[in-house]
Amino acid sequence: MATTASPQALAHGRFVRGSVSKVRRVLDQIRGRSYRDALIMLEFMPYRSTGPITKVLRSAVANAEHNMGLDPSNLVVSMASADMGPTMKRYRPRAQGRAYQIKKQTCHISIGVTPQDA
């Protein structure tokens, strides 16, 4: 039995500063919600990672509108994931000649939107 997959528009944000766990905490809350609800939630969440996530979400909706001709008002966040990016390592001078390592983490954000089954 052949099933036709609904079109999915993707957008990626690569090398975003922030840890994967903190970004996933936000993505888990918007997955499965409509585009409008997701934007409202992101606007009022108190997390720093909502800025880059909002940019990637808007890019995914723009891709759906421009490339596939879909209406933004009935789009749903069907896929939202964050993968680990490279870690920048820096050193901080400490007392008595020691140096502590500072890890500046990055992640890759992927968001996909599909039309709502109405």
From Swiss-Prot:
The keyword Thylakoid does not apply. GO terms for cellular component: cytosolic large ribosomal subunit. HAMAP family: Ribosomal_uL22_B. Part of the 50S ribosomal subunit. InterPro entries: Ribosomal_uL22, Ribosomal_uL22_bac/chlpt-type, Ribosomal_uL22_bac/org-type, Ribosomal_uL22_CS, Ribosomal_uL22_sf. GO terms for molecular function: rRNA binding; structural constituent of ribosome. Keywords: Ribonucleoprotein, Ribosomal protein, RNA-binding, rRNA-binding. Pfam families: Ribosomal_L22. Belongs to the universal ribosomal protein uL22 family. This is Large ribosomal subunit protein uL22. NCBIfam families: rplV_bact. This protein binds specifically to 23S rRNA; its binding is stimulated by other ribosomal proteins, e.g. L4, L17, and L20. It is important during the early stages of 50S assembly. It makes multiple contacts with different domains of the 23S rRNA in the assembled 50S subunit and ribosome. The globular domain of the protein is located near the polypeptide exit tunnel on the outside of the subunit, while an extended beta-hairpin is found that lines the wall of the exit tunnel in the center of the 70S ribosome. Signal peptide: none annotated. The keyword RNA-binding applies. GO terms for biological process: translation. SUPFAM superfamilies: Ribosomal protein L22.
